[in-house]
């Protein structure tokens, strides 16, 4: 089965072709960072316009790379939520229209489910069940994954998502958008820090997260410093250490409670070097398994949508009719 995947939930336009027999045939991505940098953050209207401009060229590009024609496609999967409503509508309307023209099924895909399954796309031997740590700009969740569509929410953020906390902390210290990755790089390059930040919500039971207080702590520390580059790096180091250790403490609890030793990391923050290294070391110590998507599949992309769509379409699933229903807010579990 050949499935075209379309991702347009926020500020990246992703398109890919996945084959149920051969795997991922091609994928392409357009990032809108340059479009939004001047505004200091994502502007929804501009995001939608960029998707309109790039969807057709990207579809043509991936089909050419895969050496297939549109009429060879068996289905089209598209992100239907959660995300920016305008951006979602651009992708969904395009997908439904193209599917109608080709007389093939279209299927709405949950953005977070696509992230959860990204590691399985590269490692088909990854079996259910597993615990997933979903860490991105909009989400920070621990999820028990028992099968496709069978999810149980174990823990969620009570305020900022972890990627959001990185970006906001960077902005508070004068790092331009998108600052989260820059903040992480500063932390990685800093050998040591005199600062010790709190590990929020680790002094009580439960698997929920909270990062807004950590962000405030970083701001207060920055304001009390000389505000030199060295101070910025040391604060970044302390902030990242606190985030990583907090995530690991919660993962340890989730693994212990579930009695599973299989962990999957998903979402854009899954590309963080310090987090990957710390999780790998801990999992090795307990003789467990941890799966990370390749860096290019951590952030939003069309490949994960095409893969999730292929898995569901092979079970006979598809949208009914031409109605386009996107869900800016759409709980996974």
Curated annotation (Swiss-Prot):
A molecular function GO annotation: N(6)-L-threonylcarbamoyladenine synthase activity
Protein origin, superkingdom: Bacteria
Catalytic activity reported: L-threonylcarbamoyladenylate + adenosine(37) in tRNA = N(6)-L-threonylcarbamoyladenosine(37) in tRNA + AMP + H(+)
Pfam families: TsaD
Chain residues that bind substrate: 134-138, 167, 180, 272
GO biological processes: tRNA threonylcarbamoyladenosine modification
InterPro entries from the UniProt entry: ATPase_NBD, Gcp-like_dom, KAE1/TsaD, Peptidase_M22_CS, TsaD
Keywords linked to the UniProt accession: Acyltransferase, Cytoplasm, Iron, Metal-binding, Transferase, tRNA processing
UniProt keyword Acyltransferase, yes or no: yes
CDD domains per record: ASKHA_NBD_TsaD_bac (cd24133)
The EC number(s) this enzyme carries: 2.3.1.234
Cofactors (names): Fe(2+)
Protein location: Cytoplasm
First-listed, main subcellular location of the protein, grouped into a coarse class: cytoplasm
GO cellular component: cytoplasm
Co-factor: note: Binds 1 Fe(2+) ion per subunit.
Family: Belongs to the KAE1 / TsaD family.
Protein name stated in the entry: tRNA N6-adenosine threonylcarbamoyltransferase
Organism: Legionella pneumophila (strain Lens)
Gene: tsaD
